[in-house]
Amino acid sequence: MRLLVDANIFLDLFYNRGELAEISNQFLDATYDHKDVIYVAATTIKDMAYFIKRTVHDDKKTNDYLINVYGKICKIVGITDDDAISALYEDGDYEDNLLVFTCQSNMCDAIVTNNKKHFINKGVCVLTPNEYLKIRK
């Protein structure tokens, strides 16, 4: 499977948010075991850099973390002009709409997020990490 992963999955891990972090970690392990491909939008890395730097207050540590996470386990995909413009025409949150169009333009099978309600009736398959784990058992 080709999975576009929302920033909230990585934020759960970074901030060690209890059960959400555990499930997110199991999700990442399972993608590796099943040879699924994790895609992440370049804008997600930008967002993560902001949160990490705000926490660690160190550019090098921030960059090292991003390299270790995104450089090793993810394929980074860009945002096209068409994705950016199309997302503006949709109702709802721009960043969520941008993920939808990025998912479609990169032929991903699903978006993985903990906020499924943000993607209702958007025309893409959306899974929580738990749902992915159930599918892959």
Language-model features, listed with the residues they occupy:
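Short, well-structured N-terminal submotif of metal-dependent ribonuclease cores
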Residues: 1-40, 55-60, 121, 130-137
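Acidic, PIN/NYN-like endoribonuclease modules and their adjacent C-terminal/linker elements
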Residues: 2, 72, 105-137
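Acidic active-site catalytic centers that drive phospho-/nucleotidyl reactions
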Residues: 6, 96, 115
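Alpha-helix capping/helix-boundary segments
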Residues: 9-10, 44, 83, 99, ...
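PIN-domain endoribonuclease scaffold, especially VapC-family toxins
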Residues: 25-92, 97, 101
